[in-house]
């Protein structure tokens, strides 16, 4: 099962279905992710806050699937909002994942009360320009927040990942 892909406005594409890795840790997590890749998942969704980027990276290495055939998404945690903090956080994520690039880097939550998401967005634009991330996006942003990013930077997120499930 290889999922169909959707084209993004930045020219990249994402599989329609991905494997969420929240809660997948240690050896059991590695095995679950390797199994998911073997079954055809090509989009792996992790986050700094999940504490399992190293597990995802190890599963990718063990999977036998070429890195360029996988889409790895990770997310900037709220405590790392700000320009310099965003740059440093991605470097930490890349080190834990043991990858040269991240395919999709998202701001995990906007945290409007600290109002640093635009600074983080500017850093993410720079990271994309440097080739360290392929696509940049956000998670759980409102339309007004998306408009603000566009107004202040001229760059619209390629993705706005929305959390939605029966327990949310």
Language model feature labels by segment:
Residues 22-24, 47-49, 75-79, 107-110, ...:
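Active-site beta-loop-alpha junctions enriched in small/polar residues
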Residues 19, 36, 44, 56, ...:
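Conserved, mostly hydrophobic/aromatic
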Residues 1-70, 100:
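N-terminal binding-site loop/beta-alpha segment at the start of enzyme catalytic domains
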Residues 60, 64, 94, 128, ...:
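Conserved hydrophobic residues forming the short capping helix/wall of the S-adenosyl-L-methionine
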Residues 1-6, 54-61, 89-92, 143-147, ...:
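Alpha-helical scaffolding within the catalytic cores
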Residues 110-168:
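Beta/alpha (TIM)-barrel catalytic core signal, keyed to glycine-rich beta->alpha loops juxtaposed to Asp/Glu
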Residues 24-37, 82-97, 119, 144-148:
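Short, acidic/polar
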Residues 77-126:
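Glycine/small-residue-rich loop that forms an oxyanion/phosphate-binding "nest" at active or ligand-binding sites
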């Amino acid at each position: 099962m290889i999922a169909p892909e959707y084209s993004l406005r930045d020219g990249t594409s994402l599989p329609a279905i991905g494997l969420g890795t929240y809660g997948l840790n240690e050896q059991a997590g590695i095995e679950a992710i390797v199994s998911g890749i073997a079954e055809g998942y090509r989009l792996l969704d992790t986050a700094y806050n999940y504490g399992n980027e190293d597990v995802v990276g190890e599963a990718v290495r063990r999977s036998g699937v070429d890195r360029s055939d996988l889409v790895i998404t990770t997310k900037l945690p709220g405590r790392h909002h700000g320009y310099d903090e965003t740059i440093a956080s991605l470097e930490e994520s890349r080190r834990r994942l043991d990858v040269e690039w991240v395919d999709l880097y998202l701001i995990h939550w906007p945290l409007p009360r600290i109002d640093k998401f635009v600074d983080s967005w500017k850093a993410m634009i720079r990271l994309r320009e440097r080739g360290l991330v392929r696509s940049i996006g956000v998670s759980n942003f409102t339309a007004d927040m998306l408009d603000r990013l566009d107004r202040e930077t001229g760059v619209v997120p390629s993705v706005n990942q929305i959390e939605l499930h029966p327990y949310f």
